Amino acid sequence: AIFSDTKNCLEYLYVGDYGKEANIKADFLGLTKEINGVIHKKVDLEDKMVVTISTQKGCPMKCKFCDCPKVGFHGNADISDLRAEVMSAIVRSGCQHTKRFNLHLARMGEPSFNWNNIKIYLLCYLKDDVSVFMDADVIHPVFTTMLPRTLGSKTLKRIITEFCQVKNYEFRGEAGLQLSINSTDEYQRNDLFRGRSLS
């Protein structure tokens, strides 16, 4: 289910699984060929719940494959916004127990532009916010970045290193890092990201 908080310019969702048939980005890129031999099975929320939240109110990256440019950019989500998105998604799901709770920092916004708030949220609030409303055997945050050129490689390296420390020490290895590449062709990648991502 997708939720829009128009007052705070935020959007978030929860799903059990979001298979290829719902992959808008793959369709945009023309990746419509069905993969035979891979059986898609719907995942029950009690087995795996995926909550995807906005880390910014809109996004300054303006990628060609995304609808965020239509929203505009209205700043970073603050810690109370991050908390409200997660707790609201859990409550609205009605799920009280899950074996695996994945939090994807990937709905609207580029998380590296809001790293300070995200780091505080992951270190100080996420586990408590989940445990108030559900019993989760594993809590697994996922940091997805487009590697924005404006931050520079030194700052991006620091942010990724700090996230890996949060992963290793706060979540005992239970966290993921995703690099949003979208194409291995450098020209196509630069076009899709409008030259705003490191190659």
Residue ranges and their predicted role:
Residues 28, 70-72, 191-197:
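Short glycine-enriched, charge-decorated loop/helix-capping segments at active-site entrances
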Residues 1-49:
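Flexible, acidic/Gly-rich N-terminal and inter-domain linker regions that tether
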Residues 35-36, 43-88:
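Canonical Radical SAM [4Fe-4S] cluster-binding loop centered on the CxxxCxxC motif
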Residues 12, 53, 177-179:
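Short beta-strand motif preference
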Residues 1, 11-13, 61, 84, ...:
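SAM-dependent transferase fold signal centered on methyltransferase-like domains
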Residues 90-199:
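Conserved AdoMet/S-adenosylmethionine-binding subsite of the radical SAM
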Residues 5, 16, 57, 147, ...:
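Non-catalytic surface loops within mature trypsin-like serine protease
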Residues 19, 69-73, 184-187:
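A short, flexible beta-alpha/helix-coil linker loop
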